From Swiss-Prot:
This is Indole-3-glycerol phosphate synthase. Disulfide bonds: none annotated. It comes from Acidovorax ebreus (strain TPSY) (Diaphorobacter sp. (strain TPSY)). Pathway: Amino-acid biosynthesis; L-tryptophan biosynthesis; L-tryptophan from chorismate: step 4/5. The lineage of its organism: Bacteria, Pseudomonadati, Pseudomonadota, Betaproteobacteria, Burkholderiales. Its EC number is 4.1.1.48.
């Protein structure tokens, strides 16, 4: 695990402990199980792909540890609506909302605001290290959760996937290398995210996805993450058979994120 990732995960351990003092595991689970039906995250991606379009998970992200504040004019509901509308022809399939406070200046309310403003399924983008966070995610309205292989040992990762599935939530498992991919493929989820950013060096290379794609079975839906900034990046990946993408920074820097999405994936 990289130094920054370890630092983040250590903070998460403290955050979860504090959260459980405010709301017990039992109460959080009860709240999660009482929520209305989830939106079909995987189905939304596949529907776009079946139409010949890219399945885009559009990210709502105010800041990052490496770039600082990315978007000053940050209104999650407006951004979500913009993504859902696109240019009228090309639009997002799903949303991803950062809820981490300390490192990404996110918060759970951003997810709630985004989901309430449009019909798209929503991924909670955070660093999951404890089953409590799965129930917490559903309680705040998430339809999908992110499990980062580098943060989790196999048994805990499988357990957290099962908790998510019991709540009818989708799981996006994220990897960066072959060893992590091998571990991720033991899970049942069809969603496999390949992060082109090396979390140790923060260097980004699309070659990561191109190399690992060969090892992803046809029944899994590969999602390319990070480093997708220009149409040439999209064309490179789509020519290699990649049809689903998670993109944030390229859109967050644009005045109209939805139109920026439509232009990138035109």
């Amino acid at each position: 695990m990289s130094d920054i990732l370890k630092k983040i995960c250590d903070v998460k351990v403290e955050e979860v402990a504090a959260a459980q003092k405010r709301v017990s595991f039992t109460d959080m689970r009860r709240d999660a199980e009482s929520r209305v039906l989830t939106r079909d995250f995987v189905g939304a991606l596949r529907a776009k792909i079946d139409q010949g379009q890219a399945g885009v998970i559009a990210e709502i992200k105010k800041a990052s540890p490496s770039k600082g504040v990315i978007r000053e004019d940050f209104i999650p509901a407006d951004i979500a609506q913009s993504y859902a509308e696109g240019d009228g022809k090309v639009s997002a399939a799903c949303l991803s909302v950062l809820t981490d406070r300390q490192f990404f200046q996110g918060q759970p309310d951003y997810l709630k605001q985004a989901r309430a403003s449009c019909p798209l399924p929503v991924l909670r983008k955070d660093f999951m290290i404890d089953p409590y966070q799965i129930y917490e995610s559903r309680a705040m309205g998430a339809d999908c959760v992110l499990l980062i292989a580098a943060c989790l040992e196999d048994g805990l990762m499988a357990e957290m996937e099962q908790f998510a599935r019991s709540l009818d939530m989708a799981v996006l498992v994220e990897v960066h290398d072959g060893a992590e991919l091998e571990r991720a493929l033991r899970l049942q989820t069809p969603l496999v995210g390949i992060n082109n950013r090396n979390l140790r060096t923060f260097e980004v290379s699309l070659q990561t996805t191109l190399d690992l794609k060969k090892e992803v079975p046809a029944d899994r839906l590969l999602v390319a993450e990070s480093g997708i900034l220009a149409p040439v990046d999209v064309h490179t990946l789509r020519d290699a058979g990649v049809n689903a993408f998670l993109v944030g920074e390229a859109f967050m820097r644009a005045p109209d994120p939805g139109r920026a999405l439509a232009q990138l994936f035109a």
